[in-house]
UniProtKB/Swiss-Prot annotation:
Pfam families recorded: Ctf8 (PF09696)
Protein name in UniProt: Putative uncharacterized protein DDB_G0287975
Biased composition (Low complexity): 73-88, 134-154
GO biological process, one term: mitotic sister chromatid cohesion
Matching PANTHER family: CHROMOSOME TRANSMISSION FIDELITY PROTEIN 8
InterPro entries: Ctf8 (IPR018607)
Source superkingdom: Eukaryota
Organism field: Dictyostelium discoideum (Social amoeba)
Disordered as annotated region, ranges: 73-101, 126-166
Biased composition (Polar residues): 155-166
Length: 166
């Protein structure tokens, strides 16, 4: 069997994402965006990776040995039209068809570094979903929606006609 290798001309920087734990997903991930990987500003090796509402922080680590990223494709050079009408269940003819198919590997890139995420993910809450004025979310002083905290007692509840169990 001959293996043909061709190199693509466009240079891309490839990384391995080294995550601790496991990712759970539903459905097919084919042609889907897994997350957003960004390089932190004013740093050389720090990256952040946002998956859904989780954010991971990692560092760029060089690999001991580089890895080659390749893509396998099958080439069918069978020009004989008599074999096209035969069924694939015929073992003798199926072996002949496999010999006519050649495999080609194209080099997509070389991976020299990995981004290693060693800490647990932090939860990312968009600023628009935070309600200021609650005891858990202190309002910044520059916010126009600043609500001064009001002490609520059973006798001075903001709810109309409150019912309390005594």
């Amino acid at each position: 069997m001959q293996i043909f290798i061709k190199e693509s001309t466009n240079k891309k920087e490839w990384f391995i994402l080294d995550l601790q734990g496991h990712l759970e997903y539903t459905g097919d991930l084919k042609n889907e965006t897994l997350g957003i990987l960004t390089k932190k500003p004013n740093t050389k090796d720090d990256f952040s990776f946002q998956i859904g509402n989780s954010v991971l922080v990692g560092k760029r680590v060089p690999l001991k040995k580089p890895l080659l990223v390749i893509k396998k494709s099958k080439l069918n050079n069978n020009n004989n039209s008599n074999n096209n009408n035969k069924m694939a269940v015929d073992n003798k003819d199926n072996k002949d068809n496999e010999k006519d198919k050649e495999v080609e590997y194209s080099i997509e890139g070389i991976c020299n570094d990995k981004i290693q995420f060693t800490t647990r993910p932090t939860t990312f809450i968009p600023q628009s979903s935070v309600v200021y004025g609650s005891p858990t979310h202190k309002s910044p002083s520059s916010s126009p929606k600043t609500i001064s905290p009001v002490k609520v007692s059973p006798t001075s509840s903001p709810i109309k006609n409150p019912e309390f169990n005594n």
